[in-house]
């Protein structure tokens, strides 16, 4: 059956065309969803209401429920009709073409289970993980805490994930065809002196499935991990990562760029050291930054003494300081991906002005909803 829209009116998705039964049903359901839920993802009213309901649940439970709901709407075929359009603003970074510079940071979709639904929201790229060679449960619950007064979250998840095998199976059957980054880390029980082997295993496994790879040495929730950011430990790890990258390039006849994700908790000397080490390593980018262990911005909050990394609005300035410092050292020799404290268009644009080529969001996405993607992309595009 084919249904022809009235010749003087646009079709249910705003186009004059003939619809197949499946397309008509998808558009019809989209209209129903918009009417019933009130432009659910534009965030003006309904997202705030839904968020307030979800925030009555424990954070990790709300997180999982939200992603399952997103998957359900995606499977109905209506999700992409519900979200506001994200302005096109193509950029080329690390040799990859991004439809817009606003990506999803690692941590939201650790096991690459929700890529297809998340891909409907308009992200310029999606980063999944952190994945480790072996599955691990992470730290005991509760391990995530909201600080809504600060638009912030404290987490001590501890690289909980189902391991490389599970993630690869998800990636192999994905329908999402946008730019995919895979964030890799070390298992908690791997001795520090063997850390490089975990990263090598991950890089080898994901190399031919990823558009880019991120080496995570900056989570505060794996004991000893942040020590890999400094001194000979960093230089030796970067050398091992580069060696594995070149070996994989030879095996697959394809070059996959690798970025390194760093913490915001380093002084100017640390920034200079990291910048020099990255350039000397021959790797391809740096992601600045991960969560902070500082509690200065949230002092006095009932959760401020919880162990873990603080993300969200309080990381805005620390992240900017690192980006500016890196850019001063690196210039255009190595691209920077800015992440941390992006809660609106202005905070996304200032990351670009500070020297980043791309940005990523996570905690701001939880507090603001999918409308933040388009707002951030529009603000960056307006910079010219």
Mark where each language-model region is.
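An N-cap/entry alpha-helix motif that binds or orients negatively charged groups
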Residues: 45-91, 155-160, 164-165
């Amino acid at each position: 059956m084919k249904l022809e829209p009235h010749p003087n009116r646009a079709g249910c998705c705003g186009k004059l065309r003939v619809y197949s039964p499946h397309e008509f049903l998808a558009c019809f359901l989209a209209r129903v969803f918009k009417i019933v839920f009130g432009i659910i993802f534009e965030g003006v009213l309904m997202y705030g209401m839904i968020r307030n309901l979800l925030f009555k649940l424990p954070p990790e439970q709300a997180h999982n429920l939200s992603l399952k709901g997103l998957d359900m709407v995606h499977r109905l075929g209506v999700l992409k009709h519900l979200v506001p359009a994200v302005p096109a603003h193509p950029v080329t970074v690390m040799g990859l073409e991004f439809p817009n510079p606003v990506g999803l940071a690692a941590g939201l979709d650790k096991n690459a289970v929700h890529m297809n639904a998340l891909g409907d929201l308009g992200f310029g790229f999606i980063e999944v993980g952190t994945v480790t060679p072996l599955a691990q449960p992470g730290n005991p619950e509760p391990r995530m805490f909201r600080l809504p007064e600060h638009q912030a979250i404290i987490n001590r998840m501890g690289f909980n994930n189902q391991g490389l095998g599970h993630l690869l199976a998800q990636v192999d059957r994905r329908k999402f065809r946008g730019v995919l980054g895979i964030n890799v880390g070390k298992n908690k029980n791997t001795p520090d002196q063997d850390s490089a082997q975990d990263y090598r295993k991950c890089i080898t496994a994901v190399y031919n499935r990823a558009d880019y790879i991120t080496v995570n040495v900056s989570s505060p929730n794996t004991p000893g991990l942040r020590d890999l950011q400094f001194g000979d430990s960093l230089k030796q790890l970067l050398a091992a990562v580069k060696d594995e990258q070149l070996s994989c390039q030879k095996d697959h006849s394809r070059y996959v760029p690798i970025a390194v994700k760093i913490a915001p908790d380093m002084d100017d000397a640390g920034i200079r050291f990291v910048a020099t080490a990255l350039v000397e390593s021959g790797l391809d980018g740096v992601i600045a930054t991960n969560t902070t262990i500082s509690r200065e911005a949230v002092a006095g909050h009932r959760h401020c003494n919880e162990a873990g990394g603080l993300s969200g609005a309080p990381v805005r300035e620390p992240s900017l300081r690192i980006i500016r410092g890196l850019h001063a050292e690196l210039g255009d020799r190595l691209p920077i991906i800015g992440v941390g404290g992006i809660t609106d268009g202005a905070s996304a644009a200032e990351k670009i002005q500070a020297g980043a080529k791309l940005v990523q969001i996570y905690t701001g996405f939880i507090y603001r909803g999918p409308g933040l993607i388009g707002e951030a992309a529009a603000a960056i595009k307006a910079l010219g």
